[in-house]
């Protein structure tokens, strides 16, 4: 069951005109100005109960904020509650630290499993590291989206188990923007996971942009934060290597790409985003691969953007809610 509530901000106070006369020597009778309103996002996950939406809405309204959109999801036959609200507020009247405290009070009341606030104009961008192997089409797409301001992240470094020449487009781009590139040579016997953990220890999450190495359970536990992968196939079908060939051999009529959270089980983590494109008997393996690559880069950047905008929440043991 999905409940959606949408409100639009309207009727904000406008500047009061300045009244001038010889008596007041041109001074304003009222020098007030409209407040500077900034956007915020809040996500909430708890056991379902009566009055949660009212409490969260009242919290925003009581501080002079205004809700622009409110999404709620309560799964059928499952006593859990998910919500995501977008609102605007005056940070002078409602300081950033107080926003966290007020929502935390509600979280404690309902025993929330998740309550997160993000204010993009104040909060630092998420720090990420990108891991990849030989192919760089997903990396290039992410770098261009980041350069255009369409990907709200701070790319701390790029790590690869393949060395790249300094005169390539990717390396010149990274050098121009001051993004470190780390070549970490790996073997079947030594995946250099301790070295990678040291490089990414200060990041908020990791992105595997076609990193063709399986991360161990020890690595995932040692990192302790989310890792997002792009798989060049439509999961849960065609797991593992060469999914385009698997799909081609199976005679599918849709080819796809899947972005998902990484777990210890290969290509089996909760799915964040999937994209598909039609194929036919006229396609060959080469066109399958080309279409797959086009989908991969779009699918991955969309998943990262959704994650940064707090649209992705864990649901059950292996699902996600994506608002």
UniProtKB/Swiss-Prot annotation:
<dbReference type="InterPro" id="IPR041729">
    <property type="entry name" value="Formyl-FH4-Hydrolase_C"/>
</dbReference>
<dbReference type="GO" id="GO:0008864">
    <property type="term" value="F:formyltetrahydrofolate deformylase activity"/>
</dbReference>
<keyword id="KW-0554">One-carbon metabolism</keyword>
<dbReference type="GO" id="GO:0009853">
    <property type="term" value="P:photorespiration"/>
</dbReference>
<protein>
    <recommendedName>
        <fullName>Formyltetrahydrofolate deformylase 1, mitochondrial</fullName>
        <ecNumber>3.5.1.10</ecNumber>
    </recommendedName>
</protein>
<comment type="similarity">
    <text>Belongs to the PurU family.</text>
</comment>
<feature type="domain" description="ACT">
    <location>
        <begin position="41"/>
        <end position="124"/>
    </location>
</feature>
<keyword id="KW-0378">Hydrolase</keyword>
<dbReference type="InterPro" id="IPR002376">
    <property type="entry name" value="Formyl_transf_N"/>
</dbReference>
<dbReference type="GO" id="GO:0006730">
    <property type="term" value="P:one-carbon metabolic process"/>
</dbReference>
<dbReference type="GO" id="GO:0006189">
    <property type="term" value="P:'de novo' IMP biosynthetic process"/>
</dbReference>
<dbReference type="InterPro" id="IPR045865">
    <property type="entry name" value="ACT-like_dom_sf"/>
</dbReference>
<dbReference type="GO" id="GO:0005739">
    <property type="term" value="C:mitochondrion"/>
</dbReference>
<dbReference type="Pfam" id="PF00551">
    <property type="entry name" value="Formyl_trans_N"/>
</dbReference>
<feature type="active site">
    <location>
        <position position="267"/>
    </location>
</feature>
<dbReference type="InterPro" id="IPR004810">
    <property type="entry name" value="PurU"/>
</dbReference>
<comment type="function">
    <text>Deformylase involved in photorespiration. Prevents excessive accumulation of 5-formyl tetrahydrofolate (THF), a potent inhibitor of the Gly decarboxylase/Ser hydroxymethyltransferase complex.</text>
</comment>
<dbReference type="InterPro" id="IPR036477">
    <property type="entry name" value="Formyl_transf_N_sf"/>
</dbReference>
<keyword id="KW-0601">Photorespiration</keyword>
<feature type="transit peptide" description="Mitochondrion">
    <location>
        <begin position="1"/>
        <end position="25"/>
    </location>
</feature>
<keyword id="KW-0809">Transit peptide</keyword>
<keyword id="KW-0496">Mitochondrion</keyword>
<dbReference type="GO" id="GO:0046653">
    <property type="term" value="P:tetrahydrofolate metabolic process"/>
</dbReference>
<dbReference type="InterPro" id="IPR044074">
    <property type="entry name" value="PurU_ACT"/>
</dbReference>
